[in-house]
A protein has these predicted regions:
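Winged-helix-like regulatory helical subdomains adjacent to P-loop NTPase cores
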Residues: 19-23, 33-35, 39-110
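Membrane-interface alpha helices of multi-pass inner-membrane proteins
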Residues: 28-32
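Short, amphipathic alpha-helical interaction segments positioned at domain boundaries
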Residues: 138-147
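Conserved small helical "lid"/interfacial subdomain of P-loop NTPases
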Residues: 1-25
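Conserved nucleotide-binding/hydrolysis micro-motifs of P-loop NTPases
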Residues: 2-4, 47, 138
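Short amphipathic alpha-helical interaction segments
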Residues: 106-122, 126-128, 132
Length: 147
């Protein structure tokens, strides 16, 4: 991960000059991506395109860019999702809903943590302050499926 301050300065310098709420836009980008370089690059590039070419309102541009990324990767996410077993899906749904892993009473604790270990080894889950789905756009896609 790149330090928040360094990343925010880098993005701020590159957003279009006519964007009046640059700081808010950058904060929304970095809070969504948690300063992960790959996901930040994806989101920031799309935000830049929307601000520069589509002249979208800065107040809504990040949310629209996220929705576009989720929609763009829908088939990829669906394919990934279908390859998970029922336990992995349950764990992922719990993680995106901020449910504590230990409080999942539908599955034995050892099963939950075996699933987390498997998902971490596959690169879908990481542990920062807590376990979470690494790809913020995949996490959003999972949340939308639950709704």
């Amino acid at each position: 991960r790149i330090p928040h301050y360094n990343f925010s300065q880098y993005i701020l310098e590159r957003l279009p000059a006519d964007c009046t709420t640059k700081t808010d836009v950058v904060e929304q980008i970095l809070s969504t991506t948690r300063c992960h370089p790959y996901y930040t690059q994806q989101l920031a590039a799309l935000v830049w395109d929307f601000l520069t070419y589509k002249k979208l309102d800065a107040a809504e541009v990040v949310e629209q860019a996220i929705a576009t990324l989720v929609r763009t990767h829908d088939l990829d996410f669906e394919r990934i999702w279908l390859n998970f077993n029922k336990t992995d899906r349950s764990v992922l749904m719990g993680l995106v809903s901020n449910v504590q892993l230990a409080s999942n009473r539908r599955l034995p604790t050892s099963t939950v943590y075996s699933s987390v270990k498997r998902l971490m080894q596959s690169g879908y889950v990481i542990k920062l302050d807590a376990f979470e789905v690494e790809d913020p756009f995949f996490a959003r896609w999972i949340r939308q499926r639950q709704a």
